[in-house]
Amino acid sequence: MIEVKNLSKSYGSKLAVDGISFTAGESEILGFLGPNGAGKSTTMNMLTGYLSSSGGQALINGVDILEDPVRAKKDIGYLPEQPPLYLDMTVMEYLNFVYDLKKCKLPRKSHLAEICSLVKITDVSRRVIRNLSKGYKQRVGLAQALVGNPKVLILDEPTVGLDPKQIIEIRTPVSYTHLRAHETLR
């Protein structure tokens, strides 16, 4: 699903990512560990096409993210460290917007309802995002990443700033998504 070969990123003379290589297969969960400034977020931004690399290659399902970003991004669900939320929209307005943006072909109403149920935001789906707690905003961010059933899910610090209960509530849908993908392969 993901194949990274000698991926690097420089900012002037500062090397942020130095020739990282790895592969991640279907239904595999990987994590990047390291101190602040180690290049974890930079690597994820390169994998998702939000940042170009200085060298190397990143393939998403065999498609080079730099050579054909539109095709590669169709298979990616991404939750950046700061969720890209439109605070003046309701949760459902926002998810419908993301659905349209991703040109999702799944049945709209049932697909979005399933995602809301999975990340436990059904009860706040009519509320304006600005008025939600940090935990709910994070769940909405995860929901937008799940729209379209992406084959690759990239989450950048999805639990930062959450309390222990909220962390468990975020991890549960991620694990469920992983298991569901694994069951599909059987």
Label each residue range with its predicted role.
Residues 149:
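Conserved catalytic motifs of ABC-family nucleotide-binding domains
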Residues 96, 100-124:
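Conserved ABC ATPase "signature" region
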Residues 56-67, 71-72:
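Conserved ABC transporter NBD signature motif
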Residues 178-186:
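Single conserved hydrophobic/aromatic residue that forms the stacking wall/gate
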Residues 35-39:
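Walker A (P-loop) phosphate-binding loop of ABC-type ATPase nucleotide-binding domains
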Residues 153-157, 162:
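Catalytic Walker B motif of ABC-type/P-loop ATPase nucleotide-binding domains
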